[in-house]
Swiss-Prot record:
Involved in the maturation of [NiFe] hydrogenases. Required for nickel insertion into the metal center of the hydrogenase. GO terms for biological process: protein maturation; protein modification process. PANTHER family: HYDROGENASE MATURATION FACTOR HYPA. The gene is hypA. One of its GO terms (molecular function) is nickel cation binding. It comes from Methanocaldococcus jannaschii (strain ATCC 43067 / DSM 2661 / JAL-1 / JCM 10045 / NBRC 100440). Ni(2+) binds at H2. Zn(2+) binds at C78, C81, C97, C100. Pfam families: HypA. Keywords: Metal-binding, Nickel, Zinc. Transmembrane segments: none annotated. It comes from the Archaea. This is Hydrogenase maturation factor HypA. NCBIfam families: hypA. The lineage of its organism: Archaea, Methanobacteriati, Methanobacteriota, Methanomada group, Methanococci.
Amino acid sequence: MHELSYANAMLEAILNSIKKEEEKGKKIKKVTEINLEVGELTFINVEQLKFAFEVIAEGTVCEGAKINVEFIKPKCKCLDCGYEGEPEILDEFEVYCPKCKSIRLKLSGGKEFNIKNATVEYED
């Protein structure tokens, strides 16, 4: 389940950012929302990611944070027919040109996993 690895990376990145904010004198009480950009070619199961994050964030300022996911579509250039645009995706092993069905593609994008931003509550 690679979702657990992604959840761990998310939590670590957010807690590191919070630590930097606290070093500047800002005290963060709670993270309420986390917005992600996730490439479709990562094949991340969002429900499993949310569950894994919920479990590992327990007892931290991230406990109970709402996770929103924006999916990023991959782009391709077909090396056979020259098509440029979105590929057809059946699963992680079958990605092909929608025009000529070739698997000879140059892919770009679709593998991102970014924390776009997080909403926090500060202590008074």
